[in-house]
Amino acid sequence: MKDAMDSRERDALRNISASCLCAKARKAARAVTRFYDRHFAGTDLEPGQFTILVGIRLTEPVPTARLAEHLGLDRTTFTRNLGVLERDGLVAIERGEDARQRLISLTAEGRRRLKAAIPRWEQAQQAAISTLGKENFSDLAAALSLPAEFNKSE
C-alpha cells in the first residue's frame, strides 16, 4: 500500500533531490572515474591506483598514515588498495625506525607502470579540458579542493 505524501514532505524531497551536495558529489565522482577509466584502459592500472603510485613516488619512502591522509582515504580503503598494489608487486612496504611505522616505496615494476601510465593521464586531462573548457576545468578542480575543509572543522 502506497503512503500518501503531503506537500511538505514532497517539497523537502524535491529540495533534497535537486540540491544534495553528497548525492551530486557521488554522481560526479562516478562520472569522472568512468571518464578516467576509459583513458587508463590497457595500462594495467586503475585511476585510483595511479593516484596512489603518484603520491608514493613524490615522497618515497612515505609512511602509510601520511600517504592515506594526503590522499584523503580512510584506513580501511587505503589498506585494501595498498594490499592490491603490494600483491601485484608495484609497492614495497618496510618497517620504519619506529617498529610501528610502515614505509612505502615503489618497486621497479611500480615505477615502470607509473611511467607508462603518465601519457594516458595527460590524454585524460586534455580530453577533460576539451570537454569542459579550460575555465570550467580550472573552476571545477578548484571547487573539488573545498570539501577537504569539512574534515578540518570536525
For the regions a language model picked out, list residue spans one by one.
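C-terminal regulatory/oligomerization modules of transcriptional regulators
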Residues: M1-R14, P119, S130, K134-E154
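Short hydrophobic/aromatic-rich motifs at helix boundaries and adjacent loops
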Residues: A4-D11, L21-K24, F35-D37, V54, ...
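N-terminal helix-turn-helix DNA-binding core of bacterial DNA-binding proteins
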Residues: N15-S19, A23-R26, R30-T77, L103
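Alpha-helical linker/hinge and terminal dimerization helices associated
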Residues: A28, V32-F35, H39, L71, ...
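Alpha-helical structural elements of signaling/regulatory helical domains
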Residues: L45, V62, T77, A116, ...
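Charged, amphipathic alpha-helical coiled-coil/dimerization segments
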Residues: P61, G83-S145
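DNA-binding alpha-helical recognition surfaces that contact promoter or target DNA
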Residues: R80
